[in-house]
Amino acid sequence: MKELSSSLRRIILLTLVVGIFTMPVGAASVAVSPPRLTFTPGPGGYFEGEIEVYGAKDKDIRVKTYFLDWDFDPSGNVQFYSERGRVQRSATAWLQLEPKEFLLPAKVKKHIKVWGRVPAGTEPGDYWSMFFVEFIPFSGLQTSGVKISGRVGGSVTITVPGMIVPTGRISSFTITYKTEEENPELGGKIIFENTGNGILEPTGRLEIKDLQNKLIGTVPIPPAKILPGAKREIELRHTLTLEQGKYIAIALLDYGGEKLAGYQRIFEVK
């Protein structure tokens, strides 16, 4: 343990929220910084920060700002929700942006204030939202050229200090081995559950042993970001040549807890 400070419309993006991402904004360059905001206020505490929007090289742009709730589906794809109430640990209701809409002249940098207050009585743990800076097509001062549109987003994480306990487990593990192809492939799927109140990013390995417990090979397990209370399917695909026989596959994940999470399977290569 450690102390640390229905929407009917949803958009699914095939990306991990580890920083900033963009939807096309046209030929001219537009930038938003920083890619993520983190705050650690206590229950009832006020927090404040800012993001900077850098204007296009030669175009005036109309801009609006807002927050959206998000989470991951079991495969790790990001899901955004246009209506609130779908995400249990959402921080969106606590957050404010100012200004909400403005005209950004070419080559000008604009500061956007982000602030809020954690409701009194909020339990310790991680809460989150996503800010968006959307560029609206604007032609009031243009007679030709590219019209810029699209949006840039970044993550907001609020950690309410207290007893934040990283707990989790591997609830399922399957293993396969294909020999029909030119390159024999070891495959499988791990389902990891985050049973704690903080965001986990487990890393680990898959150990392949023979029945005499001799280590034959090691396969890295892809990293994943798993929200509190969520399950994540982690796919395994790795080229590995094995002789015929039975083997033991041991999945080991370090998620920051006192012990590694583990799961064992026996499989056969024919």
Protein language model features and the residues they cover:
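Short, solvent-exposed loop/turn segments enriched in Ser/Thr/Gly
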Residues: 33, 43-50, 110-112, 123-130, ...
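Short, acidic/polar linear motifs in exposed loop/turn regions
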Residues: 55-59, 71, 120, 137, ...
